[in-house]
């Protein structure tokens, strides 16, 4: 078995399988396991579906769990376009329908929370619950206060020169996120996971695709502003890091949804699943159950 396959299989939770589906011409890699109502887990930037490993077995006890790699990440295809969050949500909804499901609960972290919101906003009749974890919603409220923060320069770091600068240095670039966005870098992304993520984004067009997530924010802002004209009625759980987005995302979600429960996770930075596993996993499981 190739080394890469060994690494992938070694980190696949018991009871889960990894597959690929062609969704409207785009190959989407996903992990699936469990039985019951469907929960879709959407990862963020610098990560893949692997980030959900601590949560997947817990949810699989009562749910069918689908954890895809977003277009452009992990084992999914990396086409030149289609990285606005409306399109990414359509990819995931297409996967769900192809697997024979319609009704879902959606969980998203970082870029994944934007995709989760776009999914719920476009298909509100198909989404019963939403969990959003630590980032922000472009186009909602004072979103530009985050988008234009000097410390978040990476939102504007794309194009040929940035690509040339990070080529072969993917992990060096990602260390900035993993270390600086954590409350304590020693409790951030584990070493084994850092190797997995760096290798995934080092694949052909991986970094280009990642940059496209941010390049699309202005389009996302237009789309989300239009979505927000109609508040969503399904329950939302918003989890944020005390040392990261704090109450900002919670207040944003209250502008777009009518039933919002927000928790600022004490002592955590951006990487909630890794920094505060013992707080976050039970909270998500309880909410979705």
Task: Describe the role of every protein-language-model region.
Residues 1-3:
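N-terminal export signals
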Residues 6-19, 26-28, 38, 66, ...:
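Flexible "cap/lid" subdomain of the alpha/beta-hydrolase fold that forms the substrate-access gate
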Residues 26, 32-75:
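Conserved HGGG/HGGXW glycine-rich cap/lid loop of the alpha/beta-hydrolase fold
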Residues 48-49, 114, 269:
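A short, glycine- and basic residue-enriched loop/turn
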Residues 54-57, 61, 121-122, 282, ...:
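Short, well-ordered alpha-helices that flank and scaffold nucleotide-derived cofactor binding pockets
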Residues 268-277, 281:
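Catalytic histidine-centered segment of alpha/beta-hydrolase-like enzymes
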């Amino acid at each position: 078995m190739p080394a890469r396959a060994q690494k992938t299989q070694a980190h696949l939770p018991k009871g889960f399988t990894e597959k690929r589906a062609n969704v409207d011409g785009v190959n989407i890699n996903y992990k699936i396991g469990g039985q019951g109502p469907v929960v879709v887990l959407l990862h963020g930037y610098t990560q893949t579906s692997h980030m959900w490993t601590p949560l997947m077995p817990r949810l699989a006890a009562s749910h069918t769990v689908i954890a895809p790699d977003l277009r452009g990440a992990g084992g999914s295809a990396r086409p030149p376009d289609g990285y606005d969050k409306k399109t990414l949500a359509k990819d995931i909804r297409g996967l769900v329908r192809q697997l024979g499901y319609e009704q879902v609960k959606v969980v998203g972290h970082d870029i994944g929370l934007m995709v989760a919101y776009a999914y719920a906003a476009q298909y509100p009749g198909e989404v019963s619950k939403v969990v959003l974890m630590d980032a922000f919603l472009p186009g909602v409220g004072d979103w530009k206060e985050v988008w234009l923060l000097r410390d978040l320069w990476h939102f504007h770091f794309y194009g040929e020169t940035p690509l040339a600068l990070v080529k072969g240095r993917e992990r060096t670039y990602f260390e900035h996120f993993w270390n600086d966005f954590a409350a304590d870098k020693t409790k951030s992304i584990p070493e084994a996971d850092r190797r997995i993520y760096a290798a995934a984004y080092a694949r052909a067009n991986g970094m280009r695709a990642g940059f496209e997530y941010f390049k699309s924010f202005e389009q996302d802002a237009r789309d989300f502003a239009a979505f927000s004209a109609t508040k969503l009625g399904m329950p939302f759980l918003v989890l944020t890091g005390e040392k990261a987005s704090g109450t900002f995302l919670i207040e944003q979600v209250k502008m777009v949804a009518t039933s919002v429960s927000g928790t600022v996770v004490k002592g955590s930075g951006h990487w909630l699943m890794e920094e505060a596993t013992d707080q976050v996993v039970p909270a998500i499981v309880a909410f979705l159950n």
